[in-house]
Amino acid sequence: MSDIEVSIAHALGDFRLEVVFTTPAKGVTALFGHSGSGKTSVLRAIAGLIRADHGTVKINGEVWQDDRHFVPTHKRPLGYVFQEASLFPHLSVRQNLEYGWRQIPADQRKINFDTAVELLGIGPLLERATSRLSGGERQRVAIARALLTSPKLLLMDEPLSALDHGAKQAILPYLESLHDEFDIPSLYVSHDPNEVARLADRLVLLEKGKVVTYGDAANLLTRVDLPIARYDDAASILEGYVSAHDPTFHLTWIGMHGGRVAVSREDMAVGKRARVEIQARDVSLSLKAHSDTSIINMLPARVVDTQEINPSQLIVRLELDDGQTLLSRITRRSAMGMGLHEGMRLYAQVKSVALIA
């Protein structure tokens, strides 16, 4: 069975962890929640860094822990990337990478050294001392080192949390490429909705040590009854395909049933599948399709649900013609002026779209 199965109960002082979820052992599953929700503790239990008082951790049918059996961390085939890169300070970048890689028998290495170096863009850093790396460079090296141990599971504990906004934006494309290139399932801890939207296939929502819900990320991101939809950076993920390129205005059109959106020109073949991220704050609503506006992205939609965020704002869940869902954040005044109600047909005006893959 190709699943990650977790069912653990553990006391950490006054904090009680009671977590149960099952997720496919492929792609990226994000563990999301506020600080103190138990995300890192779950990851540490899966890694064997803490031994849960009770429960089971099973990866692809292989039991790593149950009430009678416990596999120590060093015998679990996993890679772990911490919030701050834990590199050996006395070794160069190359030596850090080779440390774990050389411990794997050559016939068991699933990832080529040069491939990992190229994918993470760290070729120019190989002979550099780790003390001379920026925060973003250190994390890329740490990720490459984890990959080169040929893990069956990659655990990433808020790997971007210590980076500034610019460094985060620089490293996200590497993480996106990583999960496209290698068939290694990942559990990714984050409290940033933008990271989750860009990287996750599935989502486990945690609150006060318990699982609120888990499932498909695109669906859960747009559930207005869940706290993630109320974050300032709340976003939706839409899937489509490259429908056309506009060389005059350097745009690429991403088509979906019933509409299309434009992104900055990308060198992608027409017909190729694509995913885009749309921030809820970048989606306004209109009763009519307008041509006398600077907004060129308009998608016909139906109002599914609304939820008050604060006394002045609402979050609106929309369903597009192809069944995909989209969030919009608008003022209560605007909603009242439009006569907004469940089932209403209208147009979503999308100011900005980010291509993910």
Residue ranges and their predicted role:
Residues D180, S190-G259:
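Internal alpha/beta loop-helix hairpins
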Residues L154-E158:
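Catalytic Walker B motif of ABC-type/P-loop ATPase nucleotide-binding domains
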Residues G258-Q307, Q324, R332-A357:
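Glycine/charge-rich catalytic "coupling/switch" loops of P-loop NTPases
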